[in-house]
Amino acid sequence: MEERGWEQLDFVYISGDAYVDHPSFGHAIITRLLETHGFKVGIIAQPDWKDKNSITILGEPRLGFLVSAGNMDSMVNHYSVSKKHRRTDAYTPGGVMGKRPDYAAVVYSNLIRQVYKKTPIILGGIEASLRRLAHYDYWSDKLKRSILLDSGADLISYGMGEHSIIEIAEALDSGIAVSDITFIAGTVYKTKSLDSVYDAEILPGYEDMKQDKLEYARSFYTQYCNTDPFAGKRLVEPYNDHLYVVQNPPALPLSEGEMDDVYGLPYMRTYHPSYEKDGGVPAISEVKFSLISNRGCFGGCSFCALTFHQGRIMQVRSHESLLDEAKMITQEKDFKGYIHDVGGPTANFRQPSCEKQLTRGVCKNRQCLFPKPCPNLKVDHRDYIKLLKELRDIPKVKKVFIRSGIRFDYVVADKSDAFLEELCRYHVSGQLKVAPEHVSDDVLTLMGKPENSVYQEFVKKYNKMNQKIHKDQYLVPYLMSSHPGSRMKDAVELAEHIRDLGYMPEQVQDFYPTPSTISTCMYYTGVDPRTMQPVYVPKNPHEKAMQRALIQYRDPKNYDLVMEALKKAHRMDLVGFDKHCLIRPRKFEGRSQQKVPGQKTQNQKFSGKPGRNDRGKNKNEHSRRNTVQSDRQNSRQNTGTDRSRQKKKSIRNVHKKK
């Protein structure tokens, strides 16, 4: 501030992430954007939430505080799906965990309020965006109020926020009180009166939703149907004491020119140099040599919050903008010739799903790709193919990878195989990661994913294309266990599919109920909010562990869970020595095997080695067992290989009889 000659900042941005001046980080985009509009902005990254003075180091801002938990919801950042503390934080210098609080946006806002009673506070970022109205919180297992009320903030700028934050800043700068800023799209505010609220749809009250989960399901689906900036209505959520939280319709999507402007701001493209001594910020490694080409997604997966945050309308950058950034990347001293990614939420979405999307918005009660591709869907990869070719032709670029995810059903829907050939020939390095998620059509329907037959068609096309171009390349499917609707029989079906593939997935995602997804609503309410029909929800931790273990049934550590799961599913036909079996039966005496918790293994029962409960037993008995065991071993050695083969046969026969 002294170097710039600033006595007071217009805004102070409080972030739960370390400061990284790169367009993959929300705080970098918002602060750079405000700067280009003439506002003075300072950043306090990861303040000490136990010390209220930590947010005073830049003084009181003239217009307000901007608060974000960071690029991730702080609870997802801190905890695994089993609610265990994660060991590292990629958004903190050195990957150190614990530099931000749980529910960071609420904690930071309350910290500010302790010091600055009347200074405006505007919440932003994904944590505030997905908790803008009443929401189910998995970590406390409760229905929580709007984050606006718990935080004491004045406004929420939800979604990506470029349009709304500039309008908010200009309104405050013109002297409008923050309590009177009720007219900006993409914002949420609170009020004691609805006299000035027009054209609003009244949602179920918070207290009613706490008493009746079906009321929450209805409220959630109403919110889901109003995420479109063209057709979305103003929503009102009532609370006690005549208090209302009002959500204005979403902000309009950015045009191509606006996207170019945002990503063309003068970012330093790395973390603050003060972090160098700690080893830097790990998250930069994933994005430093990557290009963000689009935003939004019309895929509509039930477990994804993108509809609530970025929306279903595609927003893309021009080729010129992307090529300029790529050339800038090649000048980095540690650039090795590889562009790691060119994409966004879905790499191969580079245009609106249909003609009407940019003028009338997306359809309220139907999806573009689910359950079948819409007749109006425009499937065209030509622009993306051209972009990839242009990037490959840049000097110093050896290879361009695509890591964002390819929407395989969109590839299958394309009548031309040009993109698939381009992908396999130039942009895959041995393995292509795709996300079928499951194979059970019952589960896939609830996930909002295409039928398994569509994925199998893609597999055939992919393999055929690789044969054509003489490449040995594989598919690595992302799979999810314990999604609402997944019964044990569905988990077994998935395990059988993995068996047929002949490999064991290293990474398995257990369903994680994060805020503001259809799947999370199912998890909490037990119904599909789109149909209000009951949905089976695997909530018991042990059942979830069994479903997860089935996907990795080859891992010896999972034997007991897999055996239990197969018994529960009445699929003991999958225990044996035949090729179709997932696991073998317990090995017989003298052979090593795993221990069932709380039970003795076969070794303990017959080895003669005294356990804790064997103490005080007759020493002669113990000696006799050792002698018998020794005789058996000698006998086995003397009988030779024929006896061994005969014994294996008898074991198989015993199993078949059972």
Regions found by a protein language model. Name each.
Residues 50, 179-230, 242, 251, ...:
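Terminal amphipathic helices with adjacent charged low-complexity linkers/tails
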Residues 26, 45-240, 247:
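Glycine-rich beta-alpha loop elements in corrinoid/cobalamin-binding modules
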Residues 14-17, 278-305, 330, 338:
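N-terminal pre-triad scaffold of radical SAM enzymes
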Residues 172, 180-255, 489, 504-505, ...:
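C-terminal accessory regions of radical SAM enzymes
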Residues 591-658:
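Intrinsically disordered, Lys/Arg-rich low-complexity segments
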Residues 13-16, 29, 44, 48-49, ...:
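Conserved SAM/AdoMet-binding glycine-rich loop
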Residues 154, 262, 297, 322, ...:
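Conserved, mostly hydrophobic/aromatic
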Residues 73-82, 130-132, 162-167, 192-195, ...:
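Flexible glycine/acidic-rich beta-alpha junction loops that bind and position SAM and/or redox cofactors
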